[in-house]
Every structure is written in structure tokens, then in C-alpha cells.
């Protein structure tokens, strides 16, 4: 790894750790997901224990109530996803089931 790659990796690690530790006040984090038979996420569970169906999770993410997730429009519909941070374990698809 050259000096530029090393500097970038160091920067990315610092920023990611800071982002993960800072949950904005009043926001909840998604900590687990429920999938259907086709492996699509159909519900999420937050760090406060609330279980939200997918449409409700989309609505709350759009209104800024859920931390570290984004909503984007693809395939003609809104889709919930983790904020891209370069850490695979933070992806919604990697979260445990509930």
C-alpha cells in the first residue's frame, strides 16, 4: 500500500468510527431486519425495540427519524438502504434477523 492509499484508509477508518458512534439526538438506528421468502427486507427493528413495517420505515427515514439510512428511488419505487460507509457489516442486508 502506498502513502496515498494508507492516508485514505486512515481517514476512512476515523470518519466511519465517528459516524457510527454519533447517533443524532431523537433518531433511532436500525439494528435488525425481517426478510420474506425471496430475501427482501419487509420490516426493521430499531435500537429502541420498535418494529416497523417496510413502508413505515421508508416514511420515517424520509422524515429524518432513522439514523444512518437513505431512501433512493429505483425500479419505480422508493428503496431503503444504509448510508454508504465502506463497512459491509453496516449494510441492511448484513444485519441480523428478528
Swiss-Prot record:
Q: Which Pfam families match?
A: DUF3892 (PF13031)
Top-level taxon in the UniProt lineage: Bacteria
Q: What is the protein's given name? A: Uncharacterized protein YwsA
Q: What is the lineage of its organism?
A: Bacteria, Bacillati, Bacillota, Bacilli, Bacillales
